[in-house]
Amino acid sequence: MSWLQKLLPPKINRPAGNSRKTVPEGLWSKCPSCESVLYRTDLESNSEVCPKCSYHNRISARTRLNFLLDAEGRSEIGMEVQPVDPLKFKDSKRYIDRLKTTQAEVGETDALIVMQGSIKAVGVVAAAFEFKFMGGSMGSVVGERFVRGVQAAIDNNTPFICVSASGGARMQEGMFSLMQMAKTSAALTRLSKAGLPYISVLTDPTMGGVSASFAMLGDVIIAEPQALIGFAGPRVIEQTVRETLPEGFQRSEFLLEHGAIDMIVDRREMRDKLATLMTSFMRVPAGAA
C-alpha cells in the first residue's frame, strides 16, 4: 500500500450489482404556493390542503364527493346520460374524438357527477364538477344531470348542493351549451318553489357561463379560499378596459369583501359547515346531524 493510499479514507463497501434505491413515483408532492415538499399521504389525509400554507389544491369530483358525503347510502344520478356531437363540431380535432380521449384519460363520461346521499345523516343531493374533463365545461350532459339532481332533491324533499369548478360553457356544443344556463336556472326556480335550499360552493376556478348562471344563484353561496371566480378572466378584462386590476381581483376574498358571496370556508371544515346549514334550513333535530 502506497503512502497516498494510507492517507485516503477507506472505500465504502458496496454490494455487487445495481443497489441504488429508487423513490416510488407519486410519493411526494410540491405545493404550488409555498413550494413545500409534502408527503403525498399527508396531503391526501388533509383533504388536499397544504398543511404549511393552507393552499387548496384542485381535486377530482369523486374525491370531493367522498370528502362531503357519508360513506353509506350513496347512489349516482344521471350516469346513463352520455354526451353526443349534434353539431359534428371540429376544431383541431373532432369533438367526438376529443370526448373519447378525455373519457379514457379522466375515467369519467362528462364533467358533472351527481349523487344522492347524506351529510352527517342529513339527506342531500350533491353535484360536483370534474375540472379535468375539458376544463369542467358545461354542455348538454352537465345541464341534464344537474336538472335531474334538482328533481331528485324535490322528489325526496332534500337540499341540493353543487360544487362548481368550471371554465364555462362548452364551445363545441354551441347554443346547446348556452341553453343549459337557462335550463339549470329554471330547475332551481322549481327547487325554490318547493321550499328547498340550494347551497352553491365555488371552487377554483368558477368562470364563464357557470358563474353567470346556477353558481351564483344559491340561497347560500360559499367559496373556498383564494378561488378564482368571475365571468371573463382577469387578463381578458385588463386587455379590454386597458387598466390594471386591483390586487386579488376575482378571488374569493375580494368577492366576499364586495358582497358577492356569503362566506369563505376551508375545505377541511366544509362538511361540518354544510351539515350545520342544512340542519338549520330543514329544521332537522340537532342530534340527527
Curated annotation (Swiss-Prot):
Subcellular location(s) of the protein: Cytoplasm
GO process terms (BP): fatty acid biosynthetic process; malonyl-CoA biosynthetic process
UniProt GO cellular component terms: acetate CoA-transferase complex
Positions of C4-type zinc fingers: 31-53
Binding site for Zn(2+): C31, C34, C50, C53
Required co-factors: Zn(2+)
Disulfide bonds: none
EC class (word): transferase
Main location: cytoplasm
Cofactor comment: Binds 1 zinc ion per subunit.
Pathway: Lipid metabolism; malonyl-CoA biosynthesis; malonyl-CoA from acetyl-CoA: step 1/1
The protein's Enzyme Commission number: 2.1.3.15
Record's keyword terms, sorted: ATP-binding, Cytoplasm, Fatty acid biosynthesis, Fatty acid metabolism, Lipid biosynthesis, Lipid metabolism, Metal-binding, Nucleotide-binding, Transferase, Zinc, Zinc-finger
One term of GO molecular function: acetyl-CoA carboxylase activity
Domain CoA carboxyltransferase N-terminal: 27-289
Top-rank lineage group of the source organism: Bacteria
The reaction(s) this protein catalyses: N(6)-carboxybiotinyl-L-lysyl-[protein] + acetyl-CoA = N(6)-biotinyl-L-lysyl-[protein] + malonyl-CoA
Function statement: Component of the acetyl coenzyme A carboxylase (ACC) complex. Biotin carboxylase (BC) catalyzes the carboxylation of biotin on its carrier protein (BCCP) and then the CO(2) group is transferred by the transcarboxylase to acetyl-CoA to form malonyl-CoA.
Quaternary assembly: Acetyl-CoA carboxylase is a heterohexamer composed of biotin carboxyl carrier protein (AccB), biotin carboxylase (AccC) and two subunits each of ACCase subunit alpha (AccA) and ACCase subunit beta (AccD).
Family statement drawn from the similarity comment of this UniProt entry: Belongs to the AccD/PCCB family.
NCBIfam families assigned: accD
Name the record gives this protein: Acetyl-coenzyme A carboxylase carboxyl transferase subunit beta
Species of the source: Methylobacillus flagellatus (strain ATCC 51484 / DSM 6875 / VKM B-1610 / KT)
Gene for this chain: accD
